[in-house]
Amino acid sequence: MIVGHGIDLQDISAIEKVYLRNARFARKVLTDKELALFEQFSHNRKMTYLAGRWAGKEAFSKAMGTGIGQLTFQDIEIINDSKGRPVITKSPFQGKAFISISHSGGYVQASVILEDLA
């Protein structure tokens, strides 16, 4: 049974402005595994990746019904599988979490659906 659905839309340039003011912003949003991948990318790809992870984690927190205030960005990890599909590999949710991240123009959109397996 679906127990939560969250969506977030993020302007990539807004994330870039924050990152350029303080590169530690990436460390706040990304887990160690996500950060290791982030460090391998070109600047433009870094900004798209960071915005996508931000949007994905915001969408997850909305699906949980808590908002990011009761969760931290470090509580949620999103890693791409071998086909490039984003997968939530770490979260406080005990059921199944589905995520989709889409990039278009200067924006990133993420959608998360939470399913209770009980």
UniProtKB/Swiss-Prot annotation:
Instruction: Indicate where this protein is primarily found.
Output: cytoplasm
Q: Which UniProt keywords apply?
A: Cytoplasm, Fatty acid biosynthesis, Fatty acid metabolism, Lipid biosynthesis, Lipid metabolism, Magnesium, Metal-binding, Transferase
Q: Which residues bind Mg(2+)?
A: D8, E58
Provide any one GO MF term from the record. Answer: magnesium ion binding
Q: Which reaction does it catalyse?
A: apo-[ACP] + CoA = holo-[ACP] + adenosine 3',5'-bisphosphate + H(+)
Pfam families reported for this sequence: ACPS (PF01648)
Tell me the GO BP annotations in alphabetical order.
Answer: fatty acid biosynthetic process
Which parts of the chain are coiled coil? none
Q: What is its EC number?
A: 2.7.8.7
What is one term from the GO cellular component aspect held by the record?
Answer: cytoplasm
Q: Where does this one sit in the cell?
A: Cytoplasm
Q: Which cofactor does it need?
A: Mg(2+)
- HAMAP family reported in the protein's UniProt record: AcpS
* Function summary: Transfers the 4'-phosphopantetheine moiety from coenzyme A to a Ser of acyl-carrier-protein.
Q: Which family is it part of?
A: Belongs to the P-Pant transferase superfamily. AcpS family.
Name recorded for this polypeptide: Holo-[acyl-carrier-protein] synthase
Its organism's taxonomic lineage begins at: Bacteria, Bacillati, Bacillota, Bacilli, Lactobacillales
